[in-house]
C-alpha cells in the first residue's frame, strides 16, 4: 500500500516538474514510463533515457506534423502509388534515387517538363513529402502563388511570414511555372529568389514547355540569360510523356460515359 502511495506521489511530482520545464510529452506519459521502469526493473540511467526519449519523440512528431501542414501538399502525394506503366520518362530506379534526397543535400535542382496530366505535380509533391519526412522544411506552391508572395511581402504580414518560411526551406517546388507569360518585373523577383537559393536550397520546377520558350516573351536578353543560368545551374532535367492521366480517368455526370471531349 505504501509503495503504491509513493508511486502516485512520485508520478504527480514528475508531472509537475516536467510541465515546469516545458516537457509536455514527458508529462503526458510519466505514468507509462514509471510502470515500464517498475516492470522491467530499469536502472536509473535507463529510466532517465526513456524519459528524454519520450520527449524527443513527441517533439519530432509535432515538428513533422507542422512541416506537413505548412508544405502546401495536395490530397495525393504518395510516390508508392506512382504508375510506371502509364508514364514515360520516369522509371522505378530513377524515382528511387530521387526519393533518397541525395540531390537535395547537394542543392541540385530538378526540372520536370511534359504535357499536362503526365505526373509532374504528383512527382513534385511526392518529393516534397519525402523531404518533410526526412526532417527538412519543404514547400509546394504554384508560380502564381510564389510571385504574389514576393510582390506583397512588404505590405502583407501573411506574405512576409510565408516568405520567411520559404527562405529557410531546403526544398521548394514551383508548380505550373510556364503556364502564364512572365513579366519583366516578375522575372527580376524570381531571379533574386533563385540567386539567394543557389547552393543552399533545391528547386523543383514543373513546366509544360521548355524554359527557353517560356522566357522568350520577356524581350530582355540580360534578364532571360541570368534567370536561365540560375535555374539550370546544377539542374537535372526530366522529360515526361504519355497520355494524360486526367483525360483517361475523367469523371462524368452521366451513367454512360462518353469519351468525346469536343476536341
From Swiss-Prot:
Residues the record lists as binding ATP: 114-121
Transmembrane segments annotated in the record for this chain: none
Coiled-coil residue windows: none
Cited Pfam families: IstB_IS21
Keyword ATP-binding: yes
Keyword ATP-binding: yes
Gene Ontology molecular-function annotations: ATP binding; ATP hydrolysis activity
SMART domains assigned to the protein according to its UniProt record, in alphabetical order: AAA (SM00382)
Keyword annotations from UniProtKB, A to Z: ATP-binding, Nucleotide-binding, Transposable element
Gene Ontology biological process terms, A to Z: DNA replication
Entry's family note: Belongs to the IS21/IS1162 putative ATP-binding protein family.
NCBIfam families documented for this protein: IS21_help_AAA
Protein name as it appears in the record: Insertion sequence IS21-like putative ATP-binding protein
Organism, scientific name: Bacteroides fragilis
Lineage: Bacteria, Pseudomonadati, Bacteroidota, Bacteroidia, Bacteroidales
Amino acid at each position: 500500500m505504501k509503495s503504491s502511495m509513493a508511486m502516485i506521489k512520485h508520478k504527480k511530482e514528475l508531472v509537475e516538474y516536467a510541465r515546469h520545464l516545458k516537457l509536455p510529452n514527458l508529462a503526458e506519459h510519466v505514468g507509462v514510463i514509471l510502470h515500464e521502469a517498475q516492470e522491467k526493473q530499469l536502472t536509473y540511467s535507463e529510466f532517465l533515457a526513456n524519459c528524454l526519449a519520450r520527449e524527443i519523440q513527441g517533439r519530432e512528431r509535432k515538428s513533422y506534423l507542422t512541416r506537413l501542414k505548412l508544405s502546401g501538399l495536395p490530397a495525393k502525394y504518395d510516390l508508392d502509388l506512382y504508375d510506371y506503366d502509364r508514364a514515360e520518362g520516369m522509371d522505378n530506379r530513377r524515382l528511387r534515387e530521387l526519393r533518397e534526397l541525395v540531390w537535395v543535400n547537394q542543392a541540385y535542382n530538378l526540372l520536370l517538363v511534359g504535357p499536362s496530366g503526365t505526373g509532374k505535380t504528383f512527382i513534385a509533391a511526392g518529393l516534397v513529402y519525402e523531404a518533410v519526412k526526412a526532417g527538412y522544411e519543404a514547400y509546394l506552391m504554384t508560380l502564381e502563388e510564389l510571385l504574389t508572395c514576393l510582390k506583397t511581402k512588404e505590405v502583407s504580414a501573411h506574405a512576409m511570414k510565408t516568405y520567411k518560411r520559404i527562405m529557410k526551406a531546403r526544398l521548394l517546388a514551383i508548380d505550373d511555372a510556364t503556364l502564364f507569360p512572365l513579366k519583366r518585373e516578375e522575372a527580376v523577383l524570381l531571379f533574386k529568389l533563385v540567386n539567394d537559393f543557389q547552393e543552399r536550397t533545391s528547386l523543383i520546377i514543373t513546366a509544360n514547355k521548355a524554359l527557353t520558350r517560356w522566357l522568350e516573351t520577356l524581350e530582355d536578353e540580360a534578364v532571360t540569360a541570368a534567370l536561365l543560368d540560375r535555374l539550370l545551374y546544377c539542374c537535372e532535367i526530366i522529360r515526361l510523356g504519355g497520355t494524360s492521366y486526367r483525360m483517361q480517368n475523367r469523371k462524368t455526370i452521366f451513367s454512360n460515359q462518353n469519351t468525346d471531349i469536343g476536341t
